Amino acid sequence: MQQQQEANQTGAALHMGDVIKLENHLEQSEASETPVERRRRSGGRSAERTRRSPASSRYLNLINTTAPSTVLSEDALEAVHQASLTILEEIGMDIVLPEARERMKAAGAEVTPGTDRVRFDRGLILDMLASVPPAFTMHARNPLRNVEIGGNNLVFAQVASAPFVTDRDTGRRAGNQDDFRKLVKLAQSYDVIHTTGGYPVEPVDIHASIRHLDCLSDLVTLTDKVFHVYSLGRQRNLDGIEIARIGRGIPMEQMEREPSLFTIINTSSPLRLDGPMLQGIIEMSARGQVVVVTPFTLAGAMAPVTIAGAVVQQNAEALAGIAFTQMVRRGAPVMYGGFTSNVDMKTGAPAFGTPEYMKAVIAGGQLARKYNVPYRTSNTNASNTLDAQAAYESAFSLWALTQGGGNFVMHSAGWSEGGLTASFEKFILDVDMLQMVAEYLTPLDVSPDALGLEAVRAVGPGGHFFGTPHTLARYETAFYSPILSDWRNFETWTEAGRPTTYDHANRVFKERLNAYEKPPLDPAIKDELEAFVARRKEEGGVPTDF
């Protein structure tokens, strides 16, 4: 009864003329929208913002102005640092490439004859860290898509390296070229996805010897963003560097000054760097391209069961890889990658988006800042479908990497099933969440006009703000309009068939693919790219055994 009286009082307080005025504004704005935009707005459904050119997008070059969180005191941080150096000095790493061991020995590392074992004096590691650039720019073929790495910059890359792909209509299936291209097109369609991050799904219908040629040329033609090359043999790196150079239409000398390509270097935990990864560091760092050294340390499996122990091992492995980039070329751009989580101790299955993962992400950020090296993290979850688990594990991951000072976020959109599957619907859910993060990071406007004193003065006690000039001038852009949230009341939502987030995401990804526009590409560059790919295919591509 009391609630009903309050509702009546609220309704009586509204000045209907002002409400009508606001509705008229809505009708006028809807008259200029496309039918699809009007349909998204109807019934209280909030939807995507109008498409804008990259130059006008608010989602490029995100800056994280929040103070980073910490889980380690200064003493604890120093203890982790010293323990990591002790591992490198006393236990060492297995370096499974003779050329890499020779380079390390020449730089001052201790190589045990007849073995792969290399030990690093702590002074050597610290000397190598001193030449790592704290920030740099990755250059896209469209300069508006350049991304700033390091400092307070926050860059999102889409899902990468999934062997399977899924959508609600077709279900889970092996990766293929058609789905690869669709996911790449989706990455191009959203400005909050700043780079592609490798193959969003592995197209196994393309032979492995030439797969990189088809995929990398697609990344040049279907997007105008920075992209990734896999370190799976020296020649793949060289082909990737040349394709990136052709895509930008620049000489190699400029390419070496302006990094345009990145590679993920995963250690083979515990304490091992394999041949293809080391070759990748040599080829990429020697040519000034970006290396992202990322140990994959699951506590209780490939690392100690304690998160502190796993982070110590992560740090030791990362420092060894980072130091090697500087042995190859002083000042080579590199990132500190952290990917420590835990396993389900009942099954051994990896777990993501957990409290332990969050602690490891924030601790990794503290270490990266200690060394003044840009920090790579990931948006993770272990859910097998688009459900509450997928959302809350990703939300915790995003919270940790944002609060932990992450600079470069792999698997930002589309990661499902612990990385085994790229999901079209999860991609849309993640994009929505990434845009929310971006909006949260937008500085709060506290200008005199934003403080709204004149609006409060005009309305006074007991009034409302629906029809004030202050509201009418801002209502379209005052708040973030989610892609997927359904804000209709229960009755209207029921009449519409009770659609779920899964339903909306399925619809939206199809709409975005239908609206995809290929970015312009100079015909001369296209011809040079096609000629290079054709020549390399004729030469047989690359060997498929390592």
Listing of model-derived features with the role each one plays in the protein:
Residues S56-I63, E74-L85, E148-D169, Y199, ...:
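N-terminal small/glycine-rich loop or linker at the start of catalytic domains
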Residues Q2-Q4, K21-L22, E30, V36, ...:
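Catalytic-core signal marking the mid-to-C-terminal active-site face
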Residues S57-V132:
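N-terminal alpha-helical transmembrane segments of multi-pass membrane transport
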Residues Q2-R58, V111-P113, R117-R119, F136-A140, ...:
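Long, compositionally biased, glycine/small-hydrophobic-enriched stretches that function as flexible linkers
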Residues Y59-N64, K105-T112, L298-A299, S341-D344, ...:
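Short acidic (Asp/Glu) and glycine-rich catalytic loops that position anionic groups and cofactors
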Residues E89, R101, E110, D116-P295, ...:
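Catalytic alpha/beta active-site cores
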Residues I264-M433:
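Glycine-rich anion/phosphate-binding loop at the beta-strand->alpha-helix junction
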